[in-house]
């Protein structure tokens, strides 16, 4: 039984209405109400065995469980996509309910699934979470390659980063009545996603091309920064965007929604200290904004376009912190 939580208009609900029908699975449709209490009632009464949701909604369920215990042990797996699932979320779902989180990557143009994350039988000395954090391997029929800005093919070594491009029988080759540079001359779809592919064929997304931050000629992944920040006990949500900087061209701005009871004034300094031994030092943001809410798109992703517009319009109270663990500079 599938609990259908992706929006019906989001990449054809990730293909679940079709795969569910083809496999003969029952489907539970939640309607427009995706709040915690309504989902709790549906899960407890229907006891579905599979569901899919964006990380934002999965985070809401984890928070609901902290208020009143929620039993998700009925699920054999939870599929998540739309944006990267933080490692803290993957581990929390496993530790609380012994349920694996399976990441997927795709888009409407790929009908919609192209990559699915299942750890290999041989973990190669890594943890299971390490493999679940990856976007996964291409599903049969899909090819993936990594290209640089000049159109050169890059190595699949798990380290070299470039634009991910796709090709396959169900990958679209054009847009109706629209001229676009989204396709290469040799027929590959330019996804606009930045990432790498390792020797085993596992794809790892690091950012969207429009979201990656170039500071002093070096790339900073907003996705990776967000993943580390979410491990801090005081952070409920975080979005990282670029802001202009006279010396470095761009620097990361961390926009944080803290958990209740936290000191918003002291939090940026605490988070800088938290980051300093977990990421490269030049990745540590000096620009911070602590907010009551982070806007979402209609499919539950952080609305970074709206956040960038808010920054440009001066609507965010941005603090600059250069010290660690204390005060503004």
Question: Predicted regions: what is each one?
Answer:
Residues 1-5, 9-49, 64:
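Conserved AMP-binding/adenylation subdomain of ANL enzymes
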Residues 22-25, 48-53, 62-130, 143, ...:
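Gly/Ser/Thr-rich phosphate-binding loop
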Residues 51, 168, 173-174, 194-283, ...:
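AMP-binding/adenylate-forming catalytic core of the ANL superfamily
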Residues 82, 106, 136, 193, ...:
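Active-site glycine-centered loops adjacent to acidic/histidine catalytic or metal-binding residues
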Residues 134-141, 152-185, 218-220:
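Conserved ATP/PPi-binding loop(s) of AMP-dependent carboxylate-activating enzymes
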Residues 141-165, 199-200, 262-268, 303:
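Conserved beta-loop-beta connector loops within the AMP-binding
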Residues 277-302, 320-327:
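AMP-binding/adenylate-forming catalytic domain of the ANL superfamily
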Residues 309-329:
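Acidic/polar alpha-helix N-cap and adjacent early helical turns
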């Amino acid at each position: 039984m599938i609990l259908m939580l992706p929006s019906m208009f989001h990449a054809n609900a990730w293909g679940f209405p079709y795969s569910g029908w083809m496999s003969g699975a029952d489907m539970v449709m939640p309607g427009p109400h995706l709040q915690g209490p309504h989902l709790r009632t549906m899960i407890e009464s229907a006891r579905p065995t599979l569901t899919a949701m964006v990380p934002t909604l999965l985070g809401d369920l984890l928070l609901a469980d902290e208020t009143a215990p929620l039993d998700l042990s009925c699920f054999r797996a939870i599929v998540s996509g739309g944006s990267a699932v933080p490692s803290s979320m993957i581990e929390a779902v496993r530790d609380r309910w012994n349920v694996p989180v399976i990441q997927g990557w795709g888009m409407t143009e790929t009908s919609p699934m192209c990559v699915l994350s299942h750890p290999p039988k041989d973990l190669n000395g890594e943890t299971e979470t390490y493999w679940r954090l990856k976007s996964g391997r291409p599903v049969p029929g899909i090819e993936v390659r990594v290209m640089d800005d000049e159109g050169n093919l890059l190595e699949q070594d798990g380290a070299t980063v470039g634009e991910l491009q796709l090709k396959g029988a169900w990958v679209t080759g054009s847009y109706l009545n629209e001229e676009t540079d989204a396709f290469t001359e040799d027929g590959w779809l330019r996804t606009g996603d930045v990432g790498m592919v390792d020797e085993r064929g596992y794809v790892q997304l690091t950012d969207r091309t429009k979201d990656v931050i170039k500071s002093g000629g070096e790339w900073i992944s907003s996705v990776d920064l967000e993943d580390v920040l979410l491990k801090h006990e005081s952070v409920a949500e975080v979005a990282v965007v670029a802001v202009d900087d006279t010396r470095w061209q761009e620097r990361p701005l961390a926009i944080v929604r803290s958990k209740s009871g936290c000191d918003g004034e002291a939090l940026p300094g605490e988070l800088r200290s938290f980051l300093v031994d977990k990421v490269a030092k030049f990745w540590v943001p000096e620009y911070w904004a602590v907010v009551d809410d982070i806007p979402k798109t209609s499919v539950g992703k952080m609305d970074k376009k709206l956040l960038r517009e808010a920054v440009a319009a001066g609507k965010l109270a941005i603090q600059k912190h250069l010290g660690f663990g204390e005060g503004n500079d």
